[in-house]
Each structure stands twice: as C-alpha cells, then as structure tokens.
A protein has these predicted regions:
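Transmembrane helical cores of multi-pass secondary ion antiporters/exchangers
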Residues: 1-389, 402
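Cytosolic regulatory regions of ion transport systems
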Residues: 311, 318-329, 339-530
Length: 530
C-alpha cells in the first residue's frame, strides 16, 4: 500500500514539474504527461505492467466528464454567443464530415474494411477541448474575429457527436443495430442529452440560489451535479457528455453564490484529471507496437490535418464569409487528444478488430499535439491573426473581469516633476499605485529605489468608480469649417456642466489640457453633468 502511495506521489510531482518545464520549452504539457506514462509503462524504464482496457475506459470516462464539464463551466457565453452558430455547425456537421472523409480515405487508400474505416474516422472526429484550452490559455493567443471563442465552443461541444458516431458504429459492427435502432439511438443521444442537461442545470441553479450551502460544500454540490448530469442520461441511452457540457455552460454563466471559489477548485480538479487521463493513456500504450502502425497512422494524420479538417472548415464557414486567415487557423487548431484516445479504448474493448485502433489513434494524437499544438502560436502570428487589443482570457468565464480596477498609462516628459525622481519620492494621486514601468523594450516592476527617467511609460492602477448617476458622454467631430478648429481648449467658451475629457486624433488618444490645440478631424469626447 505504501509503495503505491509513494509511486502515486512521484507521478503527480513529476507531472507538476513537467508542466513547468514544458511551458518554458513551448511543448504542450499534455504531451509530457503521455511521455511520462510511457516511461512508467510496460515498455518503459519502470515497467509497470498495465493492459486493463476495461479499467482504463472507466477511469478515463470519469476524467473526461470533468474535463467536459469544466470546458462548459469556463465558457464565457457572452463572448461565445456571436460564434455559436459557426461552432455548432463545426461541432456537429463538421465532425460528421471529417469522420466520413477519414473513413473514405482509410478504405480506399489503406484498404481497411468499410465499418472499421468509419469507426477510425469517428474515434478521431472531434477536436480536443483540453489541448485547445491549454494552448489558448498558456500562450494567451488573442485571436482576431472572435476565433478563440469559436475554437473554445467548438472543441468543448464536439466530443458528444464523435462519441455518438462511435457508439453507432460499434453497434453496427456487433450486428445489433438495425435502421430503426440507429434512428432511435441518434434521437436518444441528442434528445436525452439536451433535455437532462437543461433540466439538471435549471434545478441546480435554483437550489444554489435558494439554499444556503456551507462554505466548501458548494464545490461538493457542483461536483455531484456534474456526475449526475453525465450518469442520468447515460443510463437511459442519452449522451452524457453533451448533458454535462450543457450543465457546465449554464452553471458557469449563471449568477450563483461563491462562484469565484469554485473556479480554483475545478481548475485543480480538471488539471489533475488531465494528468491522470494522459498519464494513464501513456501507461496503457506499448511503444514497441508503435512502429507497426506508424505509417498508416501518419498517413491518416496527414490526411486529417491537411485535407479532411480544412475541407470541413472551409465548406461550413463559407456561408459566413469568414476571412481566409481565420479558416486556416481554425483548420490548424483541430487538435486531437484525450477524447479520441478514450473512444479508441472503448472501440478496442468492444470490437475484435485486426487493426490496432488504440495505437493508431495514439500515434495520431501524438502527431497532432506535437506538430499542430507547437506550431499554432507561430502560425497565428504568421497569418496576422493576433489581436493585441483583446485578451483571450475574456473568452473564459473565470476571467476576473469583475475586479474593480482600472489602469492609467502615462509617459514621463522631460519637464515633468517625476523625471529623474525615485519612486519613493513621487507623490502619486490618491488611491493609485504604480504597478509597471516600461523603458524601451524592458518591462520593470517598480520599487521604492527605482529611478524614473524621461520617456518611461508608467502604468498606474486605480479603483474603478461605481455607477455614477447623472453623467453622460457625447462626441463632437471637429471639421475644417468648425469654429473650434485651430483653437486651444483654454480659448473655448467655458461651460460649467461640460468638460472635454478625451480627444481621438487618427489612431492617437489625447488627454487634453488648456494648451491642447484642436485640429480638423479631431473627435472630442465630452462629459456632461445633468
């Protein structure tokens, strides 16, 4: 018993260490967890013999349900709503198109029989939420055209459709699926998944608002809700993953008590589940078997990455007239990961196939995470898809947008009293704090002994004001014929109830004073008090 505990602790600590190292090296952490599992596995150095697919499927299903739930819980619906139609098309029809194209390729190019070809396509049909979320967050990829929200919503919602196709094909391969049975299976998967997801979410939110739950037990309650939302529809033949994702979105975007305390809890729980899942899948693999399936797996991976996925994306996004650069990034960001391997374990458990579907899928996932995951930030920059004005963290509902803090940027001119002064000697405005200093290309955290120099850009923090009644803003454009053109603000007629607070001049924002000269084309932002 103690040996197992020591081994478990060693694995967990190794995962934490690898997560830190991989982020510095730019390698996806999930890949490191898989490699660690292979290191401990039957063909690895530690040589822990593990080939219990049934046990692995159960553990991985539990891990995946929490990953799916938190994927929904972390989705900021306000940010994601404009992309919802695109995301739903990609997560439903996109999965079917991708799976169908891969199935055709496997049959005609690799000579695999029809049902098994489409089973492989179904298993790898969905993109991986854990991988996509991890890269978007860790690399802070602020993508243009709301692409981060699109990828987040698509990758979080397409696993249920891949799961549904996998279940249908496994039933067909067993000979237990007639035409009527398949129609009912599709109906049950979608209907029960949606209805139970919506119903459980509605009841849970009502209970959390009305019942006072003791501190700490709210996390227990939400954990139970997540498990319940998966188990109930699954027992009745519905899609548990779809139900879980719906409940996650509903709870994550609802106004419930202690929501901020739930975020770190589920962050930790989901992180642990990802470690467990990818480590277990690495442990279950036999690296010595990989060379036997390397060529067909590589062929499928290349076709999936450069043909099937792009064709599905370009076809489905064509009616929306999306930018080519956005389509290319969405195509490239179709990473395969945990869900694909979990479904491959399920397929291995339920078929007597001559093909090693598990290791074929395993190779495809390694290829996807290593190549696509590593190059996604690079391609985003090359395709000019990085939006410097946005923060990708806003697409997640745990982004702390409610923190009442605003930032003020200020460049130190030569004649300013702060120039050549120590921070400790500078008199800041009341209730403000100097939090950052940029000097050329260097960013510094200022201390009391830090010397402020000319052209230093300072960032000050201040409390956001509460709602102030009776204040309204208006805009006024200065034209060439305007009587204000060419005048300084001090020369304008003074109005007690109005103040020019901002001037927008082309791409420049100016905080005015009495000596500011107004020019044609200036947009004045004026504050009026009732």
């Amino acid at each position: 018993m103690l040996i197992y505990l020591l081994l478990t602790a060693a694995v967990m600590l190794s995962c934490v260490f690898l997560n830190k190292v991989s982020s510095k090296l730019g390698i996806p952490a999930l890949l490191a967890f898989i490699v660690l599992g292979m290191f401990f596995g039957s063909d690895g150095i530690v040589k822990i013999h593990f080939d219990n697919y049934a046990f692995a499927e159960q553990i991985c299903s539990v891990a995946l349900l929490f990953i799916m739930f938190y994927g929904g819980f972390g989705t900021n619906w306000k940010q994601a709503r404009p992309t919802a139609v695109k995301a739903v098309l990609l997560s439903s029809l996109g999965v079917m198109m991708t799976s169908g194209l891969v199935g055709l390729f496997c049959h005609f190019a690799l000579g695999i029989d029809w049902l098994e070809s489409f089973l492989i396509g179904s298993v790898i049909g969905s993109t991986d939420a854990a991988s996509v979320f991890s890269i978007l967050r860790s690399k802070r990829l602020n993508l243009k055209y709301n692409t981060a929200s699109l990828l987040e919503l698509e990758s979080g919602s397409n696993d249920p459709f891949s799961y549904m196709l996998t279940v249908i094909l496994l039933s067909a391969m067993k000979g237990t699926a007639s035409g009527t049975a398949i129609v009912y299976m599709i109906f049950a998967q979608l209907t029960y998944g949606i209805l139970f997801g919506a119903g459980i979410a509605f009841v849970s939110i009502k209970l959390m608002r009305k019942i006072k739950i003791s501190a700490g037990f709210d996390a227990v309650f939400v954990t139970a809700v997540a498990v319940l939302s998966y188990a109930v529809p699954s027992v009745l033949g519905g899609n548990g993953y779809l139900s879980t994702y719906i409940v996650g979105i509903a709870l994550g975007n609802a106004d419930i008590k202690n929501k901020k305390t739930l975020v770190p809890f589920f962050d930790g729980l989901t992180g642990f589940m990802q470690m467990l899942l990818f480590f277990l899948l690495g442990l279950l693999s036999f690296p010595s078997q990989l060379p036997k399936v390397a060529l067909p797996a590589l062929a499928i991976a290349l076709f999936l990455t450069f043909a099937a996925r792009p064709l599905a994306v370009f076809t489905l996004l064509a009616p929306f007239r999306s930018k080519i650069s956005q389509k290319l990034i969405v195509s490239w960001a179709g990473l395969r990961g945990a869900a694909s391997i979990v479904f491959a374990v399920m397929a291995t458990m339920n078929t007597a196939s001559d093909r090693d579907i598990f290791h074929i899928t395993f190779c495809i996932v390694l290829f996807s995470i290593l190549l696509q995951g590593s190059l996604l930030p690079f391609l985003s920059k090359k395709l000019n898809m990085i939006d410097e004005q946005e923060d990708v963290m806003k697409t997640f509902s745990d982004y702390s947008s409610e923190v009442p803090v605003q930032f003020i940027q200020f460049t130190v001119p030569e004649e300013h009293p702060w120039c050549n002064s120590l921070v400790k000697d500078v008199i800041l405005p009341p209730d403000t704090l100097l939090v950052m200093l940029q000097r050329a290309d260097e960013k510094l955290v200022p201390k009391g002994e830090t010397l402020l120099l000319q052209n230093d850009t300072l960032l000050l923090s201040a409390k956001s004001p509460g709602k102030i009644e009776g204040v309204q803003l208006s805009e006024k454009k200065i034209t060439r014929d305007s009587e204000l053109n060419g005048k300084m603000i001090s020369q304008l007629p003074q109005k007690e109830s109005a103040l020019i607070i901002l001037i927008i001049r082309e791409n420049e924002v100016i905080i005015p004073n009495g000596n500011t000269l107004l020019e044609a084309g200036d947009m004045l932002v004026i504050n009026h008090a009732d």
